[in-house]
Regions:
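Hydrophobic beta-strand anchors of alpha/beta hydrolase catalytic cores
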Residues: 70-71, 99
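N-terminal targeting signals for export/organelle localization
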Residues: 1-50, 182
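Short loop/turn microsegments at loop-to-beta-strand junctions
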Residues: 45, 69, 142-144
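Thiol/disulfide oxidoreductase modules built on the thioredoxin-like
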Residues: 4, 116-121, 128-182
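Structural microenvironment flanking redox-active thiols in thiol-disulfide oxidoreductases
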Residues: 82-119, 128-135
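A short beta-strand-turn-helix
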Residues: 47-70
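Aromatic-flanked redox-active Cys/Sec active sites in thiol-based oxidoreductases
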Residues: 72-78, 104
Length: 182
């Protein structure tokens, strides 16, 4: 009896843990890809990248000074980036959220084709094919989205596709507070 009871107890314990983690993931409360960032509460790292759509222009962190905004790191090679794109369009057009994109490790022609096909949610897009800027932000995958407040401080980070649940819980309160104070 003991020979089967111990393995059964271990199996049931692991099954329960697995079920709990799945429930947390489905509710958006646990993201196994989420890695803490050292930038929360610190000044946003400065970058200067050529604009994807107009390479003669430079996109800088300082372009957004005085505003609450999102920085979204994306690439056409990233399935989750395609998944979140429609929601980014919603945020930019319906919620009037300023979003700066960094197109990372990508082919400019493919990125432009994606935007032409699906729409462009970005106020500006820095082109970073060699990781010149994203390394300073601690980016290790895409998509990653950062919220920067009006003082230029990084307040939130999300790894993975942005969706309504993440928007409501992590990012929207900052935009609501900024709208209330203006």
């Amino acid at each position: 009896m003991t020979r089967t009871a111990i393995p059964l107890a271990i199996f049931l314990g692991l099954a329960g843990l697995f079920w709990y983690v799945l429930q947390q993931m489905n509710q958006g409360e646990y993201n196994p890809r989420s890695v803490p960032t050292q930038f929360i509460g610190r000044s946003a790292p400065e970058f200067a990248l050529p604009d994807l759509l107009d390479p003669d222009r430079i996109v800088r962190t300082s372009d957004m000074a005085g505003q609450v905004w999102l920085l979204n790191v994306w690439g056409t090679w990233c399935p989750e980036c395609w998944k979140e794109h429609e929601y980014l369009i919603h945020l930019a057009t319906r919620e009037q959220v300023p979003i700066i994109g960094i197109n990372w490790r990508d082919d400019a022609a493919e990125a432009k084709a994606m935007l032409a096909r699906l729409g462009n949610p970005f106020a500006r897009i820095g082109f970073d094919p060699k990781s010149d800027a994203v390394i300073d932000w601690g980016v290790y995958g895409a998509p990653e989205t950062f919220l920067i407040d009006a003082e230029g401080i990084v307040r939130e980070k999300h790894t993975g596709a942005l969706n309504p649940q993440v928007w409501q819980s992590k990012f929207k309160p900052y935009f609501d507070a900024a709208a209330g104070s203006s």
